[in-house]
Design a protein with these regions (language model features):
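Glycine-enriched alpha-helix->loop->beta-strand junction motifs that scaffold or abut catalytic
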Residues: 41-42, 72, 89-97, 112-118, ...
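Active-site-adjacent beta->alpha loops and helix N-cap segments on the catalytic face
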Residues: 53-65, 83-84, 107-109, 126-129, ...
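His/Asp/Glu-enriched, well-ordered alpha-helical/loop segment
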Residues: 134-187
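Conserved, mostly hydrophobic/aromatic
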Residues: 45, 110, 178
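Divalent-metal coordination cores built from histidine and acidic residues
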Residues: 1-72
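Active-site-proximal loop/turn and secondary-structure-junction residues that shape catalytic pockets
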Residues: 14-16, 49-51, 79-83, 103, ...
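Hydrophobic faces of well-ordered beta-strands that scaffold small-molecule active sites
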Residues: 8-12, 43-47, 75-77, 97-99, ...
Length: 187
């Protein structure tokens, strides 16, 4: 991607297969992904979906987290509906961000514990309307926009992050806060 006109960065998959019952055609354990951390465009570990494994110290999950941390990389989360001590354990393990916030209380609980929140507005899952109040002085420094599973037709017809900025403003967000979540915080 070095010669592309856009600066593309990557996150390594954390859960392939997604669950032990899935058949993905591959099993990417920590040894399979470890050498990829040396690539400068690799930013960290993507979507740590196995929250149960994080909370209960599953050896493979912990190995992936430790490897990412050893390379000074970020760990993105995927933790819908975690609360209380389970949420504390998940975040304390080093999971840096989450895009699975379905309501304002969930997002604020994660922000108060130090996570960054990716406000998702994709094709299947749309959380912007519920989370637009986060686009304020108190929270915007830890909030950014993401699409997560946006269909190519939606990208062509509506746009990407630019669409989310416009929609956030139409929902009452301060334009400066919307632009900040689109660019500054994400960078």
């Amino acid at each position: 991607t070095e010669d592309l006109p856009v600066d593309v960065r990557f996150m390594l998959p954390s859960c392939v297969p997604a669950t032990p019952m899935d058949e993905s055609g591959a099993n990417l354990d920590y040894r399979a992904i470890d050498s990829f951390y040396d690539y400068p465009r690799v930013q960290g570990l993507a979507e740590m979906m196995n929250s149960y494994g994080v909370i209960h110290n599953d050896a493979e999950v912990v190995s992936k987290i430790v490897a990412s941390q050893a390379h000074h990389k970020k760990i993105d989360g995927h933790a819908p509906d975690l609360v209380g001590n389970d949420l504390n354990a998940y975040i304390a393990a080093g999971v840096y961000s989450d895009h699975e916030c379905h309501d304002l209380n969930d997002a604020i609980a994660k922000l108060q514990r130090g996570q960054f929140i990716m406000i998702r507005e994709g094709t299947a899952a749309r959380n912007l309307e519920a989370l637009v109040p986060l686009l304020c002085d108190k929270y915007v420094e830890r909030c950014m926009f993401c699409t997560d599973d946006k269909h190519p037709n939606d990208l062509l017809e509506k746009g990407h992050i630019d669409y989310i900025v416009k929609k956030a403003i139409s929902l009452g967000a301060d334009p400066i806060m919307a632009v900040k979540a689109a660019g500054y915080t994400a960078a």
